[in-house]
């Protein structure tokens, strides 16, 4: 869900004085400046970086690339505003300690009550050093901070000495990571020039923080453990007063120890890693250090980690393990593996397979027990690395469970509903096990917008993947009675227009008792009927277009599933919905839409069916939009100043119309916010941090794990991979994002909007929220990928691979079993009806045999098979029909694919 236009306008008054105009910063001026800026700064130049520290605090005031000094990794434009107590800067420290044996903790922060530090003499590689006692409020320990260089790289070190006569336990030790992710009042151009995104690998001694520029180009800044600084936990710094919003996610800190927090603020929540503490005896000293290095590019992060002597892990396909589809894990480090521990015990099985020519250790990881699982690898030098998996059901079972839950638990059948929402698949609260039939934000209960439409969208998209006659019968009722005619106008001036919500708040016009007294309706989101009936929000149109399109596919490709209307009728409605979006919602239609790829799929089907007049009109409207994007440096706006969902459509149309430069810009921008990290929650997880506010139950600004952006951004990533099958990185992040749509589905089929990353929660959100937009991404994009990697050998993503006598066999494990890509031949096979069981490939002859599923679950009379144009393959013994299909009768069990002469 997005902001209303009135609030949007407040956000996009882009000007250099924007910060000063913010009421918060005006108010903060009344607070005393405690960070002395007047005393100046010290400047330093390293091999690749230039940086400055304030003389008064020795905190970082600038961090720049040596060859690009216009860009600063720090929030430099806010330095003057943030020169007050409680504002964190890079170089600060948070400590929570207690005398050994005491039960209560005491917290000390160098930012809380800012005082000038005591500079000390430098020696050797030490660039600046200070005693932090004045700014740590009478802490009983001595804390010395130093900035150092190590072979041209920057090191931040804290040396802590127990100067008392009693032992002290350090229960939390955090180093704030203050980089410039604040986009307040910035245009898209200035944000991409100035700002960064950062994501953690919470992997203990192998952990790191990656800091990428928004445009995805140039080097990636990595923060690494240098000494005694394992990445144990990642805490949001909500005590920093900088206001969090749709343009500022907030800052976080790198936690080396976290025991005190797990006993207090995070009590009862199972953390990613086991919490630790450190006891310092009287007179004992311990040093903690982080190092900042540059990887040449995002794709070269792992290469740089190896150069820096860090343990590196690569999962293939990743860290979500379906129970029917074991994964491979490749590990490389200078030291031998001493042991691998699994928690919970037995949750996964780990089997060593050998090593590669490049000395990567290879393992097979099999998922046994549903839920989170952690591997802790201990190396011979006692360094530890944690790798975070989640074991899930098979893709087929998850999607089956999802469809059942949506069309049963979420099925809303109430003929007396005054808002006309019955029958439908409605928003659901998993914590109360109830339908969300009213809410202070109208769209939650209104069957439109993302949080309202997502559930019925997921239910309909599920039928594209796994058609189920009983579910389809219910959804046909919804489409005929509720969607087409209520959510979407089917006649009159607004014909084909899509409303913002069927639910609205007008107590004077409806019977007493319609609205609950326990809900606060004094909010901007409690829309009136007029507001709810508005058809000017373009983002509501792709949901409806996708529903019409799926019904077209079901009516066209299956003989008995959908017969109420002709396939032509459904395709016409899908086409008209795309036209209506541009004509009735032109303001927001200028932006890329979430699920906007649906209009390309509709266009291709119009062409396939010979409906050339409609195809020409739709293509013309879409080209006008793409031409507009071509004129922009970064066409990634939306209702928000910056967004991560329009890139899906921007990329596909730019690619379609041959705007290759804009497609490349879009792809690089996606890679900036979709990380490849050995953690199921972050790997492939597209950045989003505000939709818990507009589509969640626990509403707060927070990095969301596998929000719908994961699977939507996977569409361009995997499309780009099929164009460039040597780019293994694209496959890794694209497949991980695709699987993100299944990551958070519960064992009984409930699908939340996203997973909460806050260490105080680490759980699914309580309602369905925006989930369906992500499942759309899985439905249209999921596939099996087969590659021969130059280092790791033959691999299958969403498939079980075996090799016999040089021949390859892959059993297909996606939910649809309808798409497979053989990278070596750039062979892309898709089925619009029917299912694949396996693919067999002989590299010597290049022949490919497809075994077709004999299962009746596909409900298809014929297998409708397509082969991508780039491979040069054809189906032996069959010719394409007018629609481009190889039509294979259902009784045929296998077909042979051969290269065309």
Segments and roles (model prediction):
Residues 402, 406-711, 716:
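Catalytic cores of extracellular degradative/oxidative enzymes
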Residues 334-401:
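Extended acidic/polar, glycine-enriched regions
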Residues 183-187, 304-325, 385-427:
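Low-complexity, Pro/Ser/Thr- and charge-rich linker/hinge segments at domain boundaries
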Residues 22-133, 144, 181-261:
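Acidic-aromatic substrate-binding/catalytic surfaces of carbohydrate-active enzymes
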Residues 21, 133-143, 149-207, 383, ...:
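Acidic (Asp/Glu-rich), glycine- and aromatic
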Residues 278-296, 892-897:
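Short Pro-Gly-centered flexible turn/kink motifs
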Residues 299-321, 620-624, 628, 647, ...:
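Terminal, non-catalytic domain-edge segments
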């Amino acid at each position: 869900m997005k902001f209303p236009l009135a609030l949007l306008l407040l956000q996009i008054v882009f000007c250099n004085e924007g910060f000063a105009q913010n009421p918060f910063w005006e108010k903060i001026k009344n607070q005393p400046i405690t960070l002395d800026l007047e005393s100046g700064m010290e400047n330093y130049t390293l091999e690749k970086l230039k940086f400055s520290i304030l003389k008064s605090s020795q905190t970082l005031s600038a961090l720049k690339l040596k060859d690009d000094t216009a860009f600063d990794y720090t929030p430099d434009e806010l330095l003057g505003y943030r020169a007050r107590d409680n504002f964190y800067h890079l170089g600060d420290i948070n400590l929570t300690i207690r005398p050994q044996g005491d039960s209560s903790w005491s917290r000390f922060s160098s930012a809380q009550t800012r005082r000038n530090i005591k500079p000390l003499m430098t020696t050797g590689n030490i660039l600046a050093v200070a005693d932090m006692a004045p700014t740590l409020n009478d802490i009983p320990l001595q804390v010395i901070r130093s900035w150092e260089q190590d072979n041209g790289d920057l090191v931040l070190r804290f040396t802590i000495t127990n100067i008392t006569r009693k032992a002290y336990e350090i229960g939390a030790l955090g180093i704030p990571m203050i980089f410039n992710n604040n986009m307040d009042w910035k245009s898209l151009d200035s944000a991409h020039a100035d700002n960064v995104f950062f994501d953690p690998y919470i992997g203990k001694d192998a952990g790191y923080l990656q800091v990428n520029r928004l445009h995805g180009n140039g080097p990636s800044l990595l923060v690494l453990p240098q000494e005694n600084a394992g990445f144990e936990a990642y805490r949001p710094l909500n005590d920093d007063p900088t206001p969090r919003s749709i343009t500022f996610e907030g800052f976080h800190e790198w936690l080396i120890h976290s025991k005190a927090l797990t006993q207090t603020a995070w009590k009862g929540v199972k953390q990613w890693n086991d919490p630790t503490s450190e006891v310092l005896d009287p007179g004992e000293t311990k040093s903690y250090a982080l190092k900042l290095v540059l990887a040449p590019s995002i794709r070269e992060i792992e290469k740089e980690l190896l150069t820096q002597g860090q343990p590196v892990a690569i999962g293939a396909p990743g860290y979500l393990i379906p129970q029917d589809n074991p994964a491979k894990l490749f590990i490389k480090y200078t030291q031998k593996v001493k042991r691998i521990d699994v928690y919970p015990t037995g949750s996964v099985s780990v089997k060593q397979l050998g090593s590669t020519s490049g000395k990567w250790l290879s393992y097979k990881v099999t998922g046994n027990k549903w839920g989170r699982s952690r591997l802790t690898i201990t190396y011979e030098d006692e360094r530890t690395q944690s790798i975070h998996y989640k074991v899930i059901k098979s893709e087929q079972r998850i999607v089956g469970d999802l469809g059942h839950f949506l069309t049963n638990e979420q099925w809303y059948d109430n003929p007396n509903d005054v808002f006309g929402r019955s029958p439908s698949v409605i928003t659901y609260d998993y914590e109360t096990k109830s339908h969300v039939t009213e809410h202070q934000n109208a769209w939650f209960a209104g069957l439109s917008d993302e949080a309202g439409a997502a559930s019925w969208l997921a239910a309909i998209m599920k039928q594209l993947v796994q058609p189920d006659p009983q579910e389809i019968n219910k959804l046909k009722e919804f489409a005929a009675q509720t969607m087409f005619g209520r959510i979407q106008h089917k006649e009159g001036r607004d014909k084909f227009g899509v409303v913002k919500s069927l639910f609205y708040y007008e107590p004077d016009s409806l019977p007493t008792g319609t609205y609950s007294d326990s809900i606060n309706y004094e909010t901007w989101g409690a829309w009136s009927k007029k507001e709810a009936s508005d058809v000017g929000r373009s983002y509501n149109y792709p949901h409806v277009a996708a529903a019409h399109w799926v019904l077209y596919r079901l009516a066209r490709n299956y003989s008995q599933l959908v017969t109420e209307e002709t396939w032509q009728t459904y395709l016409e409605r899908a086409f008209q919905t795309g036209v209506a979006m541009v004509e009735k919602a032109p303001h927001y239609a200028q932006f890329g839409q979430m699920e906007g790829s649906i209009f390309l799929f509709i266009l291709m089907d119009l062409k396939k069916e010979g409906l050339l007049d409609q195809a020409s009109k739709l293509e013309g409207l879409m080209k006008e939009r793409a031409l507009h994007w071509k004129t922009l440096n970064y066409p990634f706006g939306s209702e928000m100043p910056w967004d991560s969902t329009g890139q899906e459509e921007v990329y596909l149309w730019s690619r379609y119309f041959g705007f290759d430069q804009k497609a490349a810009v879009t792809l690089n921008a996606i890679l900036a916010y979709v990380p490849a990290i050995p953690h199921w929650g972050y790997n492939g997880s597209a950045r989003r941090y505000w939709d818990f506010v507009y589509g969640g139950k626990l509403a707060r600004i927070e990095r969301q794990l596998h929000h719908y952006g994961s699977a939507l951004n996977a569409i361009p990533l995997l499309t780009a991979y099929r164009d460039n099958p040597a780019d293994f990185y694209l496959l890794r992040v694209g497949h991980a994002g695709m699987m993100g749509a299944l990551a958070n589905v519960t064992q009984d089929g409930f699908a939340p909007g996203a997973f909460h990353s806050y260490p105080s929660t680490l759980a699914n959100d309580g309602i369905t929220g925006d989930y369906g937009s992500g499942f759309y991404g899985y439905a249209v994009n999921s596939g099996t990928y087969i590659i021969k990697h130059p280092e790791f050998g033959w691999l299958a993503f969403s498939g079980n691979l075996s090799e016999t006598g040089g021949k390859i066999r892959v059993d297909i494990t996606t939910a649809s079993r309808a798409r497979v890509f053989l990278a070596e031949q750039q062979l892309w096979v898709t089925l619009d009806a029917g299912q694949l069981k396996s693919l067999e490939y002989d590299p010597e002859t290049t022949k490919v045999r497809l075994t077709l599923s004999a299962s009746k679950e596909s409900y298809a009379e014929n297998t409708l098979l397509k082969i991508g144009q780039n491979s040069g393959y054809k189906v032996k013994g069959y010719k394409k029909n007018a629609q481009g299909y190889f039509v294979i009768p259902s009784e045929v069990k296998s077909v042979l694919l051969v290269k065309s002469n």
